[in-house]
């Protein structure tokens, strides 16, 4: 069984037992969270598509860790004007382990 969930403005295809990295969620490590924004649930040939969410569907996940992604380097330059600007950014993430999908 798999599901498509929405969290942090992004969509993820998940299945039970998988680990995913999502935008940072304010939850303690080891705590269990429930994601109720389930856009689609599928199992074999049967697929339920929500309008916009599947009613009664939920995904239970456990917070494994918090961290920061690798640095993304931004470099801006204007040719012939001697203008250069360096900038870097590291995005925070939360790693989740998907425990169960209920539809």
Curated annotation (Swiss-Prot):
Pfam families in the cross-refs: Ribosomal_L21p
GO cellular component assignments: cytoplasm; ribonucleoprotein complex; ribosome
Keyword Ribonucleoprotein listed: yes
InterPro entries associated with the record: bL21-like, bL21-like_sf, Ribosomal_bL21, Ribosomal_bL21_CS
Keyword Ribonucleoprotein: yes
Record's function text: This protein binds to 23S rRNA in the presence of protein L20.
Classification via NCBIfam families: L21
Name of this protein: Large ribosomal subunit protein bL21
Gene that encodes the chain: rplU
């Amino acid at each position: 069984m798999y599901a498509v969930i929405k969290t942090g403005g992004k969509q993820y295809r998940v299945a039970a037992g998988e680990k995913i990295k999502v935008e940072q969620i304010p939850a303690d490590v080891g705590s269990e969270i429930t994601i109720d924004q389930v856009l689609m649930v599928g199992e074999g040939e049967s697929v339920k598509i929500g309008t916009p969410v599947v009613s009664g569907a939920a995904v239970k996940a456990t917070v494994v860790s918090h961290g920061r992604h690798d640095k993304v380097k931004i470099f801006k330059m204007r040719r012939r004007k001697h203008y250069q600007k360096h900038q870097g950014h590291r995005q925070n993430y939360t790693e989740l382990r998907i425990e169960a999908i209920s539809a």
